[in-house]
Amino acid sequence: MAKKVTGMIKLQLQAGKATPAPPVGPALGQHGVNIMGFCKEFNAKTANQAGLIIPVVITVYQDRSFSFILKTPPAAVLIKKELGLESGSGVPNRTKVGSLTKEQVKKIAETKMPDLNAASIETAMKMIEGTARSMGVTIQE
């Protein structure tokens, strides 16, 4: 018989740097999950992606055990990493902070593809381009 699910927790954490401090501790503590167990497992699985923010969906079961699924980093994080930016533009329609080539957009889209609701790489690229534009990044043809 399958275990009964009692909760789903969604968090965005620094890869390899999960600690029992907020936001991890309180989110897991209210479901009775072993916080240190999660932190060690998460840090071990994400050690190779240091510096990125990794979304994680934690499923908590009735016996207080848990499982989690790692997602790909948010598109904005990948764009900032590709361009070496600290943050996007405060006024994206006026101030541009950088520009991406089509090849860079395609690389980001291929990384994000498993988590995007896109049928083809072209539609995934359009989604990434939209995110880039809203951050004040121009797309070169």
Curated annotation (Swiss-Prot):
Does the keyword RNA-binding belong to this entry?
yes
Its annotated function is as follows: Forms part of the ribosomal stalk which helps the ribosome interact with GTP-bound translation factors.
Tell me the PANTHER family matching this sequence. 60S RIBOSOMAL PROTEIN L12, LARGE RIBOSOMAL SUBUNIT PROTEIN UL11M
Report the PTM annotation.
One or more lysine residues are methylated.
Cross-referenced InterPro entries, in alphabetical order?
Ribosomal_uL11, Ribosomal_uL11_bac-typ, Ribosomal_uL11_C, Ribosomal_uL11_C_sf, Ribosomal_uL11_CS, Ribosomal_uL11_N, Ribosomal_uL11_N_sf
The protein's assembly and partners = Part of the ribosomal stalk of the 50S ribosomal subunit. Interacts with L10 and the large rRNA to form the base of the stalk. L10 forms an elongated spine to which L12 dimers bind in a sequential fashion forming a multimeric L10(L12)X complex.
Q: Which gene encodes it?
A: rplK
Matching CDD domains: Ribosomal_L11
Query: What does the record list as GO biological process?
Result: translation
This chain's protein is named Large ribosomal subunit protein uL11
Which UniProt key words apply to this protein? Methylation, Ribonucleoprotein, Ribosomal protein, RNA-binding, rRNA-binding
Q: Name one GO molecular function term.
A: large ribosomal subunit rRNA binding
* Cited SUPFAM superfamilies: Ribosomal L11/L12e N-terminal domain, Ribosomal protein L11, C-terminal domain
Cite the Gene3D superfamilies for this sequence.
Ribosomal protein L11, C-terminal domain, Ribosomal protein L11/L12, N-terminal domain
In terms of domain of life, where is this protein from?
Bacteria
Q: Which family does it belong to?
A: Belongs to the universal ribosomal protein uL11 family.
- In the UniProt record, which is one GO cellular component term? cytosolic large ribosomal subunit
